[in-house]
Amino acid sequence: MKKWIQTGLAAIMLCTAAACTTKTEDDHLSRIKAEGNLVIGLEGDWQPFSYHDADDVLCGVDVEVARGIAERIGVEAEIVEGKWDGLLTGLSTGTYDIVVNGVNITEDRQKTFDFSDPYVYDRTVLVVKEGTDDITSFDDLDGRTTANSIGSSYMEMGEAYGATVQGVDDLTKCMDLVKNGTVDATINAATSINDYIKTTGETCFVTVDESDTVPYAIPMKKGEDNDTLRQAINKALQEMREDGTLKAISEKYFGIDLTQE
């Protein structure tokens, strides 16, 4: 009888250990490592976060951060470009493992996605055409028109302030619509607006209001299956922070270090 009990306990322990091992081996991070690549979604046309340079080489803050994370996890970075309004949908359906695209953390997004630690701290700004004296703050958007990327937090922000938002594909189109008077204003990241003005030399735009600091983080599908992936990404970001990689990327594209709150 004693021998039977010992044998039974051993079998139970063996099954339990096997179950635990299977769970670990079958989680998302393990599958990524087995396949050898991390599939990353980003826009590819949102300078300075992700864009093509004069030689059509994909570059930017998010591109370098994404590649740095993949390298530290020990896999290749497979970057897939897409429009903003499809990135988070693609994350939900499994098209991407993660999205690295200057994503800010909102309550609605937290219902569907888990987020890494922040890697950039930006601000959201309100931009109008020079001479637009009746819009001096976000509160003045009530009853006015803005242009923003479809499904973006900037679009949601404009609507929350009472604006009628025209959905467009990218920042350049937003700025063109403001410049030619089709819309009254646009809302976007301070870093992107500053980079656009610096790159184009346009002098007809004025920033009239800005938000508090906005942290950008990396979303992934919510659930236990991604716990180890989130931990690995946070570990990679911490290593990049400690060895100066994050700071160097920020200074390269923003001109200043925006990796600290």
Predicted features along the sequence, with ranges:
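Extracytoplasmic small-molecule ligand-binding "clamshell" domains
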Residues: 24-102
